[in-house]
Amino acid sequence: MTQDKILILDFGSQVTRLIARRVREAHVYCELHSFDMPLDEIKAFNPKGIILSGGPNSVYESDYQADTGIFDLGIPVLGICYGMQFMAHHLGGEVQPGNQREFGYAQVKTIDSGLTRGIQDDAPNTLDVWMSHGDKVSKLPDGFAVIGDTPSCPIAMMENTEKQFYGIQFHPEVTHTKQGRALLNRFVLDICGAQPGWTMPNYIEEAVAKIREQVGSDEVILGLSGGVDSSVAAALIHRAIGDQLTCVFVDHGLLRLNEGKMVMDMFARNLGVKVIHVDAEGQFMAKLAGVTDPEKKRKIIGAEFIEVFDAEEKKLTNAKWLAQGTIYPDVIESAGAKTKKAHAIKSHHNVGGLPENMKLKLLEPLRDLFKDEVRELGVALGLPREMVYRHPFPGPGLGVRILGEVKKEYADLLRQADDIFIQELRNTTDENGTSWYDLTSQAFAVFLPVKSVGVMGDGRTYDYVVALRAVITSDFMTAHWAELPYSLLGRVSNRIINEVKGINRVVYDVSGKPPATIEWE
């Protein structure tokens, strides 16, 4: 089936892939390519329109230039943040450093235009947006008009109606920009005229064919954690190659309470996949002893996983591939985007935590999907809701939820505290009868390797502290902390302190992403 397509040129923003997610939400197929994609390849791709992403650099840096021939293709172009500056700079306008960096919420005053007509927030002709820029356009190119401004950014939006070129100095792809989807839909559906035809069933068909082509008759090992990503990856790969897939469930001593039994029962009942259960707690704990640096912990856990998989591979006659449930937020936070320009934040177990001498080839069928797309894919593959809508769990498990050195004692305490938190979230509902577990996107406890003084009965205690973390997000690239009811937090705190011997204080994390990441390590 021939589909209308949008091309996104990536200049290295941490949130570039959210643009692709928003376009896909409109059921329009899109691909994200490096900013230096050759013009002949762009022509061959034959997009209905082009979106230029944001990025951390200046238009005056020669290493970050796209082929300006894109402005001669006769198709609409939308520049976002750096993309707007690139457009202005190369079409005869001027870009200069701002007097102050603008980061966070801003209100843009708009005028009626092809891009903004009928789109506004609470006040007439205003948009509540998310800014993140230093440089700004100071002079318009010929043929352009200002269609939006802020007090510190007089040219916050611009357009050339004749050529259908548009520039916006904010990020419509992040959820903080309330009308961001509406603006992107206006560009993609109305201005570009793209017809919606991209659906998850179509994606499954293409992904299954690609997996079969990649793998051939080889056998595949998948590291099964029981989380959403590895579960959906297993279902998709099993759909493609059946019994060529063997799942390896590694109990590294850093799992949630009773997780081993739950995972084995769930997959035996729901997927019919071959699953090997490996008890490797002693091996992992020995390697992690004395290690406090989070990056080193991730690398060690990744390396030990490979050791386990290598051992299992020797038992299979034709194993050539290691499958993982890597999704795009894992990749972007490790600066693993195709441009290699995004600023690195931390390595991920599924990306930068793997050793270079790995003996198996990597199969990552979910690598370009966002979390909500992965869930949608899981439902389309026939997985039960209890599996698909389970909160994410990191590959290194509790190893990155125990700050500092990992010890069995700490893991046992954290497991109990985390289970109490999740129980109470499941058992508490809002006024509409929806559980707080379903209302939050991810929730967990974090073990802090510090002790605090407390009083229980008539005695003094000196025990450990746990932090509770709950966030709400649609894409895991940005997130708000969940405003849980005080009564719920109080019950969780009371239960943990009374039921988990060794913990006497509970705190709640009220940090958003950005500036914090969702996990503490």
From Swiss-Prot:
Pfam families reported for this sequence: GATase, GMP_synt_C, NAD_synthase
Pathway in which this enzyme or protein is active: Purine metabolism; GMP biosynthesis; GMP from XMP (L-Gln route): step 1/1
Keyword Nucleotide-binding tagged: yes
EC number(s) given by UniProt: 6.3.5.2
Active-site residues, Swiss-Prot/TrEMBL: 81, 171, 173
Catalytic activity: XMP + L-glutamine + ATP + H2O = GMP + L-glutamate + AMP + diphosphate + 2 H(+)
Domain GMPS ATP-PPase: 198-390
UniProt-recorded Gene Ontology molecular function terms: ATP binding; GMP synthase activity
Subunit structure and binding partners: Homodimer.
Role description: Catalyzes the synthesis of GMP from XMP.
Name the UniProt record assigns to this protein: GMP synthase [glutamine-hydrolyzing]
Source organism of this protein record: Neisseria gonorrhoeae (strain NCCP11945)
